[in-house]
Amino acid sequence: GAVHSVVFAGFSAAALSTRINDCQCEIVITSDGSFRGNKILNLKKIVDDALNDCPQVSSVLIAERTKSKIELKSGRDKLLNNLIKNASDSCSIEIMDSEDPLFILYTSGSTGKPKGMVHSTAGYMVGAGYTFKNIFQYQNNDIYWCTADIGWITGHSYIVYGPLLNGATTI
């Protein structure tokens, strides 16, 4: 399994490169842009600027969300839609140990250098699945929505993992 690290889309290129280098990231997944109020953030440009200081990154996968004009770096950048078109419908599973790392989320850095918090596979998933089901009183056939940002632990837990672990329909 691939350990992932989601970062807040509003970070600067410097903040992004610090986190990429700290966790020794080799692949970045981003989108062409993101909506913030009535503005479009050029996420691909922020990633490109960040990667000037991240020589270990070999691939950037880009989702075309805003359809903003972007530059693709030959040999490194790939559009997700093109990859998905040619992808197999099946994928063999990777058996993971319960203590294997699942993801890294970074602290805000408000009290110093941001620290990468490593979350293990089973402990985190049991907690996220249980708290989603019981705190939000999720029932089969409910439609669920969470306003948090996916780059923070609440969004990670209750936009992604908790709903997936409970088979929830999300908006």
Language-model-detected regions and their locations in the chain:
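Structural core segment of the AMP-binding/adenylate-forming
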Residues: V3-N82
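A short hydrophobic/small-residue beta-strand
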Residues: H4, I27, Y144, T170-I171
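Conserved G/P- and acidic residue-centered "switch" motifs that form tight phosphate/ATP-binding loops
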Residues: G1, S110, G167
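Short hydrophobic alpha-helical segments of the AMP-binding
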Residues: G1, V47, G162-L164
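Conserved AMP-binding
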Residues: F8, A148-I153
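Conserved AMP-binding/adenylation subdomain of ANL enzymes
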Residues: S120, M125-I143, G151-I171
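Conserved pre-ATP/AMP-binding loop-to-beta segment of ANL
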Residues: V60-A63, K73-Y106, K113, G123, ...
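Hydrophobic, small-residue-rich alpha-helical packing segments that form membrane-like cores
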Residues: A15, I20, E26-I29, E99-D100, ...
